[in-house]
């Protein structure tokens, strides 16, 4: 919840900041999360 936080790149690295953003790959436009759990 809150893709704005994921855009920073934190959720991109796998940090538990935004599971939805990192899991969906919205937070990382160039590096989508390979793990569908945001972990």
UniProtKB/Swiss-Prot annotation:
Expressed by the venom gland. It comes from Tropidechis carinatus (Australian rough-scaled snake). Snake venom natriuretic peptide that targets both NPR1 (EC(50)=1080.0 nM) and NPR2 (EC(50)=328.60 nM). Exhibits hypotensive and vasodepressor activities. O-linked glycans consist of galactosyl-beta(1-3)-N-acetylgalactosamine (Gal-GalNAc). This is Natriuretic peptide TcNPa. One of its GO terms (molecular function) is toxin activity. InterPro entries: Natr_peptide (IPR000663), Natr_peptide_CS (IPR030480). The lineage of its organism: Eukaryota, Metazoa, Chordata, Craniata, Vertebrata. The keyword Glycoprotein applies. Keywords: Disulfide bond, Glycoprotein, Hypotensive agent, Secreted, Toxin, Vasoactive, Vasodilator. GO terms for cellular component: extracellular region. Its main location: secreted. It is found in: Secreted. It comes from the Eukaryota. PROSITE patterns: NATRIURETIC_PEPTIDE. Pfam families: ANP. The synthetic glycopeptide is highly stable in rat plasma even after 48 hours. The synthetic non-glycosylated form shows similar stability. This stability is probably due to its C-terminal tail. Accounts for about 2.2% of venom. Glycans are attached at residue 35. Belongs to the natriuretic peptide family. Disulfide bonds join 12-28.
């Amino acid at each position: 919840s809150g893709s704005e936080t994921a855009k920073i790149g934190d959720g991109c690295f796998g940090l538990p900041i935004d599971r939805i953003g990192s899991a969906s790959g919205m937070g990382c436009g160039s590096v989508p999360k390979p793990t569908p759990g945001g972990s």
